């Protein structure tokens, strides 16, 4: 099983976890918020506390956007802990897919899967074409 952390700006990570729990019930995911007044070092400390409980196991840290403070903190942690993977683009469809597969895929396979399906997580509704019937 891959352990997972949602980490994002503001209260997004906690709200994402709440939303995932509405769908699946209790899940093996933690949330780390990045709030005003904090920096990447503060986030890294919070992430390290979670990861330190299972340092020999695989982790995926899903962040909201690449190159933001959550990404920088998670990537810095991943550089020191080779069992950690970091993926950006946290959204509810991606979060649900992560939880769906964290028990069956390795961290590498899980990240590859999430990256492969990412474009399916954003769909534009289009007005159906109307066809006039001929009588």
Curated annotation (Swiss-Prot):
Induction (UniProt): By L-sorbose.
Record carries keyword Metal-binding: no
Subcellular location: Cytoplasm
NCBIfam families (UniProt xref): EIIA-man
Full protein name: PTS system sorbose-specific EIIA component
Pfam families xref list: EIIA-man
Active site: 9
Modified residues (Phosphohistidine): 9
Free-text note on domains in this protein's UniProt record: The EIIA type-4 domain is phosphorylated by phospho-HPr on a histidyl residue. Then, it transfers the phosphoryl group to the EIIB type-4 domain.
Key words, A-Z: Cytoplasm, Kinase, Phosphoprotein, Phosphotransferase system, Sugar transport, Transferase, Transport
Single biological process term from Gene Ontology: phosphoenolpyruvate-dependent sugar phosphotransferase system
Major place of residence: cytoplasm
InterPro entries in alphabetical order: Bacterial_PTS_sugar_comp (IPR051471), PTS_EIIA_man (IPR013789), PTS_EIIA_man-typ (IPR004701), PTS_EIIA_man-typ_sf (IPR036662), PTS_IIA_man (IPR033887)
Recorded GO CC terms: cytoplasm; membrane
Gene that this polypeptide is encoded by: sorF
Keyword Phosphoprotein: yes
Single GO MF descriptor: phosphotransferase activity, alcohol group as acceptor
Membrane-spanning parts: none
């Amino acid at each position: 099983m891959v352990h997972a952390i949602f980490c994002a700006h503001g209260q997004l990570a906690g709200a994402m976890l709440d939303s995932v729990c509405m769908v699946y019930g209790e899940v093996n995911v933690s949330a780390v918020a990045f709030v005003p007044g904090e920096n990447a070092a503060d986030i890294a400390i919070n992430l390290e506390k979670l990861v330190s409980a299972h340092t020999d196991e695989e982790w995926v840290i899903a962040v909201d956007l690449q190159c933001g403070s959550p990404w920088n903190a998670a990537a810095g942690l991943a550089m020191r802990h080779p069992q950690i993977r970091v993926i950006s683009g946290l959204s509810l469809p991606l979060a649900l897919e992560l939880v769906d597969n964290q028990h069956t895929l390795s961290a590498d396979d899980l990240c590859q899967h999430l990256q492969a399906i990412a474009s399916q997580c954003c769909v534009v509704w289009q007005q159906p074409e109307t066809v006039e019937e001929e009588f």
